[in-house]
From Swiss-Prot:
Function: Dicer-like endonuclease involved in cleaving double-stranded RNA in the RNA interference (RNAi) pathway. Produces 21 to 25 bp dsRNAs (siRNAs) which target the selective destruction of homologous RNAs leading to sequence-specific suppression of gene expression, called post-transcriptional gene silencing (PTGS). Part of a broad host defense response against viral infection and transposons.
Organism: Aspergillus niger (strain ATCC MYA-4892 / CBS 513.88 / FGSC A1513)
Official protein name in the record: Dicer-like protein 1
Entry GO CC: cytoplasm; nucleus
GO biological process, one term: siRNA processing
Region Disordered, annotated ranges: 37-65
Boundaries of every Helicase ATP-binding domain copy: 124-305
Residue ranges constituting the PAZ domain according to the UniProt record: 881-1009
Highest taxon listed in the record's lineage: Eukaryota
Required cofactor(s): Mg(2+); Mn(2+)
Domain (Dicer dsRNA-binding fold) ranges: 641-731
Site, as annotated: Important for activity: K1376
Length: 1525
């Protein structure tokens, strides 16, 4: 399904790339315009060039675009120069709350200061230079500085090696948490000269390509990252172990089991030849963090890290740095057994059965003993606070989703109500004061007393209280806030964990802010969990309290290391008489002996032994297969396979599909387990079933491993095991934009139809007549006489078309081809020829040589009659009297004896000036020839009197004429004929401003023998013959393709009337006036049919392909590039009408011009036109649309099917008519199979609901089978193939309906409203309305939940809608499977009915159209899209037309994937920007920000701020804001 908010993919994206330049052609147009405007009309030419000037009147729009493009390019360059976040100087003046995490770290100046290593650090440093070493030092003793020393040494050696031409190598500093990545990177940056990068998973590193990583490796010599990132880089062969010079493991004691530290060693380090392995340096406060044999565990760690444990031999030096605190034991009396408080009892009685509260009950129960009554009760207040309730409700829903009972939704709803009830009970509960006796446990009482001793007075004490549980830390912090010890300022520092309930969510940023406050003294008592023990740079404090005793040596050493001040105290809280607590103290003493043992090791003593060899390290993975790509070295393992598949799945998530993840179905079989891997719907490989294994986990990993191999075999994973789709899929989806939509090339253009050139060479003996009548919409100044157009071949019946006479009176031109021929004598041919040439001379100031053998057509007067039938004899219609009179009289001679009134209602012309043509109106008795003309008349060179005003002779001829002319002749009122030739369009303002009233004398002029009414009609002939030419050329184009298309549709399909016709709502540039409808609506219709036709063809001709293959193959067929190539091959560009009326080319060709301006040279230049490749492709789609509306011999789609085959020019679409599709379809086995009982039952139920009986119920079963349903259980294929087909069928039936109902709406409107009809949102609602959702077969708990919740919501919305049909627009989006199954059902019905489209139309009429009878209610549906909404607000609310939305690609910044910058520019001011990984989402962000800006200002402020005068200028046209894509 296309996204509901996605604009048509064919619309130009207007994406700027950094290396593009402004089009020089546009600049040249501006220059030409300026030059022409400076030229003066000398008055001597026979015709003016007003039309050309008019063509350039829109150049201001082009200039605006140039300015906007330049503005955006400058902005793009500026943004592309932005450096990475750690290179930007930190704004120290901003409060911490406004700073990013990276800036918070930088602001604290971690690691700043001189590097001053102590002797013990130098000792370990020297050891680490020559051998792999694990440094065991107390927390706070400066292990990181040893690492810095080692890095400096390693980097110095690396720089020397690089200078000698050796391969580049990189240092890696590995950490175990995101927080440490920030901290250690800050330390290294402040102590190393070389660039340091730091990365962690939340940055999206798993989706980075090798090229991105190569940029980072090139840029940085040291990389700090979490261990899993390096592990994946090594497995994907983004980097090889031999390219690393040192591996530093922070908190190296984590190297065990399947920790990424251990996997890096096992899977990559030990696989490398010994000589190419990097140096290893591990750091830890204790080499072990578990209970057990200390020496054995230490030895195992050495083996895993291929290193030697070492520590300082001079403890006095260490003591100076890492001061040991005074260790104290704070004893407390034996705790009570856990008990139920009154609040606990009350809640347990009412809500004790609720699973979502189980953890809180458990904590409150234990807290009653460990913390006391008050703390136990306060846990409920925190757990059921208002901000936590939504999370608990979500937990209830999640639990309900995992059930299969049909009453789950109701029970879940009740559970949520019970949670709310519990919250209200807690809110109304009267909590006792913690000061009350018995409210606090003995343990908390001791802590309170001791802290009161430290903080009861002004003090510099800083304290950390360590707890085992996060909730304990939170409750204790709340308690001590309440107790109000005078100088105690409590705070909390707990770890980051996703999915927490009870308000315990905390971010890395909040951790840093707590540390910053602790450092500055704003907090002086931190209640912390283990997150404060390990590695974090917590400033020295003088009191550390173990509220909960440590569990391991490492916890003890690390927490003790936090007490670094001189005379600091480390207090352990121990229960009196608790043997376990006492035993733990003894264990720590034994572990301390281990550290002493480490320190006494001789320098050459190795703890390698023979009982821990490499075989034991690798033994765990024995039997697990691996696969290595030789070219890159990338390695596939059982562990990495699942991660690779997860990455592959996420690369397919281009829309909001919930299921862009891998599904693993593990089933028992013959005492073993087999796993089926099901990949997301968009994957071309659906998955596979793995080999049997004895464990579920091994079966899952084995199947994932085999799936990776299958994807690799099908070239869906690259040489680094990355999905190819982060590059390929967008390119395929954007195939419609894979050609240039802006750049144009010159192509040949036919300016005259070939029909005019046929049968020439001799005078005609017979001609075919076409009767031309004028039907004005209102009274005209002159009654137009009908005309006859005679041609050598019979003309087709042309559609009626309008022209605009007088003051834009719309007049319909009706052409009627006569059936009978006109047989002619030589004299009659001569009469026709003379009349036609006389029209050219008298009316248009062109005198041609009389050559009837070269003439293409003849014009003749017709007898005036209301109408003529085609069967009439042309000889009876022709006005022979007028024809003979014109032949015998060159003009009507002037006579002084004539009655003055006899000169009225004649056509008069100046023989020497083509601009002067008049219709006489009446005698003006108030003027004489010597009178000055009235001041309002049009200006001419001589204005001294009427006689001179009419005279165009040269100086000498003028004097001679004036000396002999008759100064007593009458002066006539006359109407000056405008120089307007393009009557196909209304007048321009310039043409309208021409003054047509004038006064003339007859003697200086010539009176035409052509009757005035006929001359008036002949003035329209250039427009009429131009339109006839266009019809004939379009017909010729269709005939060249062997299409039978209606003439009006053919011309519409070939008509491009502006430079940017395809930008429907944009202000059109260089508009060609009077061309009629352009191709855009037909292109919209044809595009839809093309999609449907190719979908059907692929479905029928490729039964074994899956949906992905169909999508890719269809895109290759319908993409603009393919259409363009086919069009060029068939020379379709010749027939495209890209120019409107031309006063240069409407004249007949081949005649010899004797007098008048020769336009032949200009006509030659107009035989070429500039077309964009996309325009040519769009015309192909328009031709398909025209063929569709023209029908066919057997089926109304026949001609359109033939057009598709011709224009896609591919073996994948071979049908010549509609019924060919059926003949190509081979019924698959599953469809022919006899239906079982369940399938028959489903068929009957659907027939009851939708009134269609399936001949093949198995088709219906396939339509309702979700891709998640395991193939082992399914008897039919999933619905994807049918959904692909049905999607195009629904598109077609909806578009046809809108196209027919709204003939005057532009494609943008049609697209926006089609979006509502075919949107996932509507089709999902329709699925529930029709009750289809209950029949879907799937295997997914989240899917069940989503369907249930959505069905309840949409049914509730319908019930509350009071009959409103648009109730579905206000609900959340449905699960994608629901619209998919509707589309699949439509596809199944289509196939089952033998491709009967009428069945689809019936489904549309019965179930879809009732929702869309009134399309006005969906006007805002598309407008909710930010880009459309912004367009509407700027144009309608603010009246602005000078704005645009530009988007352009930016180079990669700080190694991130290449981004796209979008900007909204209003009157050359950038008002909003947005960046994203695609143009679509960048435009959305920019539009949203721009809307926020507009929300803050009024219309008056807008005009003042942006100097917008669009409303005042009255320019109602609209500029291109760009599209949503």
């Amino acid at each position: 399904m296309p996204s509901a908010h996605a604009f048509d993919m064919r619309i130009t994206s207007d994406i700027y790339k950094p290396d593009q330049h402004l089009p020089m052609e546009t600049m040249k147009v501006c220059a030409v315009t300026m030059t022409e405007d400076l030229q003066e009309d000398d008055g001597s030419s026979d015709e003016s060039d007003n039309d050309e000037r008019e063509d350039h009147s829109k150049t201001g729009v082009s200039q605006q675009r140039i300015t906007q493009n330049a503005k955006f390019k400058a902005l793009l360059a500026q943004r592309a120069d932005t450096g990475p976040i750690h290179d930007v100087s930190v704004t120290h003046d901003l409060p911490d709350a406004q700073l990013s995490t990276a800036h918070l770290v930088a602001k604290q100046d971690l690691g700043i200061g001189t590097l001053d290593p102590r002797e013990y650090q130098l000792e370990l440093f020297e050891r680490a230079k020559v051998q792999n070493t694990i440094a065991v030092l107390d927390t706070g003793s400066g292990k990181t500085l040893i690492a810095v020393l080692l890095l400096k040494h390693t980097l110095e050696k690396e720089l020397n090696d690089r200078m000698e031409g050796k391969p580049h190598r990189i240092a890696f500093f590995l950490v175990d948490s995101v927080t440490l990545a920030y901290q250690q990177a800050a330390v290294l940056r402040n102590n190393l000269d070389q660039s340091v990068g730091h990365f962690f998973g939340a940055m999206g590193t798993d989706l980075w390509s090798k090229s991105v990583w190569d940029q980072h490796f090139q840029k940085n010599m040291v990389i700090v990252c979490t261990a899993e990132i390096l592990n994946q880089c090594l497995l994907n062969s983004y980097i090889k172990m031999s390219q690393i010079n040192i591996l530093i493991f922070d908190e190296a004691h984590h190297t065990k089991k399947d920790h990424p530290y251990a996997r890096i060693i096992r899977d990559s380090y030990l696989e490398e030849v010994y000589s190419k392995r990097p140096r290893i340096f591990g750091m830890t406060a204790s080499p072990i963090d578990t209970k057990g044999d200390i020496v054995d565990e230490a030895t195992r760690l050495e083996k895993l890290l291929d290193s030697r444990i070492a520590t300082t031999s001079n403890m006095s030096l260490l003591r100076q740095v890492a001061r040991r605190p005074v260790e104290r034991v704070w004893s407390f009396n034996k705790l009570e057994q856990p008990f139920a408080t009154s609040l606990y009892k009350h809640l347990e009685d009412r809500f004790g059965d609720m699973a979502c509260l189980e953890g809180i009950f458990r904590f409150a129960w234990q807290a009653s003993s460990e913390l006391g009554r008050w703390c136990s009760d306060r846990a409920w207040a925190r757990a059921l606070a208002d901000d936590v309730l939504p999370k608990l409700e979500g937990s209830v829903r999640k639990t309900a989703n995992s059930e299969t009972s049909s009453n789950v939704p109701e029970s879940a709803y009740k559970e949520i109500l019970r949670i709310t009830e519990a919250s209200e009970i807690v809110k109304s509960y009267a909590f006792s004061s913690p000061e009350t006796f018995g409210q606090l446990s003995p343990k908390v009482q001791v802590l309170r007393e001791e802290l009161a001793r430290y903080f009861g007075r002004q003090t510099e004490t800083k304290c950390i209280v360590f707890t085992q549980k996060r909730y304990t830390a939170l409750i204790l912090a709340e308690l001590f806030q309440t107790l109000n010890i005078p100088f105690l300022r409590p705070g909390v520092l707990i770890g980051v964990r996703s999915g927490d309930l009870a308000g315990m969510n905390i971010t890395f940023r909040q951790q840093f802010i707590s540390l910053v406050k602790f450092r500055t003294g704003e907090i002086n008592c931190l209640f912390a969990t283990s997150v404060a023990e390990e590695g974090l740079d917590i400033p020295d404090c003088n009191l550390v309290v173990r509220f909960d005793l440590y569990q391991t040596l490492i916890q003890y050493v690390q927490s003790r290391g936090r007490a670094r001040h001189f005379n600091s105290t480390y207090a352990s809280m121990v229960e009196r008489g608790n043997l376990e607590h006492e035993q733990r103290l003894l264990e720590v003493q034994d572990a301390e002996m281990m550290q002493s043992f480490c320190r006494t090791l001789p320098e050459d003593r190795l703890l390698y032994g023979f009982d821990h060899d490499l075989d034991t390290v690798l033994q765990k993975d024995e039997g697990n297969r691996t696969f290595r790509i030789k070219s890159t070295g990338a390695k596939l393992t059982y562990h990495s396979a699942t991660a690779i598949l997860a990455r592959y799945a996420s690369s397919l998530q281009y829309e909001k599909e919930f299921s862009a993840q891998v599904t693993y179905v593990v089933l028992p079989i013959n005492g073993a387990f087999v796993c089926e891997v099901i990949l997301p719907e968009k994957s071309p490989i659906r998955g596979l079933t793995g080999s049997p294994a004895m464990k579920k986990s091994i079966a899952k990993r084995s199947a994932a491993f085999d799936t990776c191999l299958l994807l690799r075999k099908n070239k869906l994973l690259d040489d680094h095991f990355n999905s190819i789709y982060h590059r390929r899929l967008p390119a395929m989806r954007n195939a419609k934009l894979a050609i240039t939509s802006k750049r144009t090339s010159q192509y040949d253009m036919i300016s005259k139809p070939s029909l005019w050139g046929r049968k020439q060479g001799m005078p005609p003996k017979e001609l075919h007549g076409t009767f031309i009548t004028f039907l004005p919409s209102m009274q005209l100044s002159h009654e137009p006489a009908p005309l006859l157009l005679f041609t050598r071949e019979r003309l087709p019946h042309f559609p009626e078309f309008p022209i605009f006479l007088d003051d834009d009176v719309e007049t319909t031109i009706i052409t009627t081809p006569l059936e009978k021929q006109l047989l002619l004598s030589e004299k009659e041919v001569d009469a026709l020829t003379v009349f036609t040439l006389r029209v050219f001379r008298d009316v248009f100031h062109k005198t041609y040589d009389k050559e009837p053998e070269k003439m293409a057509y003849w014009l003749a007067p017709a007898k005036v009659q209301s109408s003529y039938l085609p069967s009439y004899d042309p000889r009876q219609i022709l006005d022979w009297e007028s024809l003979t009179y014109v032949r015998d009289n060159d003009s009507i001679p002037f006579s002084t004896n004539a009655d003055p009134e006899s000169w009225v209602d004649l056509f008069v012309f100046d023989a020497w000036d083509g601009r002067c043509r008049f219709f006489t109106v009446g005698v003006e008795h108030s003027l004489t020839p010597s009178s000055p003309p009235p001041p309002f008349v049009a200006r001419r060179r001589h204005m001294n009197d009427v006689m001179n005003y009419c005279l165009s002779l040269s100086k000498n001829s003028r004097a001679k004429f004036l000396s002999t002319c008759h100064w007593d002749q009458p002066v006539l009122r006359a109407e000056l004929v405008r120089l307007r030739r393009n009557l196909l369009d209304k007048m321009t303002d310039t043409e309208r401003d021409v003054e047509t009233r004038c006064f003339i004398c007859i003697e200086p002029l010539k009176v035409s023998a052509i009757p005035a009414s006929t001359a008036f009609s002949c003035l329209a002939f250039p427009a009429i013959i131009s339109r006839i030419d266009a019809y004939l050329i379009s017909l010729q184009g269709c005939e060249s393709l062997n299409f039978t298309v209606k003439l009006d549709l053919a011309l519409e399909a070939f008509t491009k009337d502006s430079d940017n016709t395809d930008e429907h709502r944009a202000q059109q540039i260089h508009v060609q006036r009077g061309m009629g409808r352009n191709y855009e609506r037909l292109e919209f219709l044809g595009d839809c049919f093309l999609k449907m036709a190719t979908s059907i063809a692929l479905f029928t001709q490729n039964p074994d392909d899956d949906e992905f293959d169909y999508h890719v193959n269809r895109m290759c067929l319908i993409c603009n590039k393919n259409l363009f190539n086919a069009a060029v091959d068939k020379e379709i560009y010749k027939y495209i009408r890209s120019r409107g009326f031309s006063r240069h080319t409407w004249y007949p060709e081949g005649l010899k011009l004797l007098q008048g301006k020769d336009h032949s040279r200009k006509a030659t230049t107009e035989s070429k036109h500039a077309l964009a490749e996309k325009t040519i492709a769009d015309v192909c789609e328009a031709l398909i649309g025209a063929a569709l509306l023209s029908g066919g011999p057997d089926h109304r789609f026949d001609m359109a099917v033939k057009a598709v085959t011709t224009l896609v020019n591919s073996p994948s679409h071979k049908a010549e008519r509609w019924k060919d599709y059926i003949s190509f379809y081979t019924i698959p086995k599953y469809q022919r199979r006899a239906a079982d009982g369940a399938e028959l039952y489903l068929s009957r139920k659907i027939e009851e609901k939708l009134s269609y009986r399936f001949r093949y119920p198995t088709l219906l079963g396939s339509a309702f089978t979700h891709p998640s349903y395991p193939s082992a259980w399914a008897k039919v294929p999933c619905y994807q193939r049918l959904e692909f087909l049905g999607d195009s069928l629904i598109d077609m039936v909806c578009v046809e309906d809108l196209f027919a109902r709204f003939p005057d709406r532009d494609p943008q409107w049609l697209t926006e409203h089609k979006m509502a009809m075919v949107s996932n949102k509507f089709l999902g609602a329709l699925a529930v309305k029709l009750g289809l959702h209950t029949h879907l077969k799937y295997f997914s708990a989240p899917l069940q939940s989503q369907i249930t919740q959505y069905a309840e919501e949409i049914q509730t919305a319908e019930g509350e809608s009071e009959g409103a049909v648009d109730y579905w627009t206000v609900t959340k989006d449905p699960p994608k499977c629901l619209p998919d199954m509707v589309e699949a059902y439509v596809g199944a019905v289509f196939v089952d009915s033998d491709f009967n489209f009428e069945v689809i139309e019936r489904f549309f009429r019965d179930y879809i159209k009732p929702f869309f009878e009134d399309m006005a209610i969906y006007d805002t549906f598309a407008n909710k899209h930010p880009t459309t909404f912004l367009h509407n607000r700027l144009t309608n609310e603010f009246g602005c037309v000078n704005y645009c939305l530009k988007a352009g690609e930016m180079p990669s910044i700080d190694g991130a994937p290449a981004g796209v910058l979008a900007a909204v520019i209003v009157h050359d001011v950038v008002i909003a920007e947005g960046t994203a990984t695609s143009g679509r989402y960048a435009k959305v962000k920019a539009s949203e920000k721009a809307l926020a800006v507009l929300d803050e200002i009024s219309s008056a402020e807008f005009q003042r701020k942006f100097r917008c005068d669009c409303r005042e200028s009255g320019d109602s046209a609209r500029l291109d804001i760009g599209t949503a894509i």
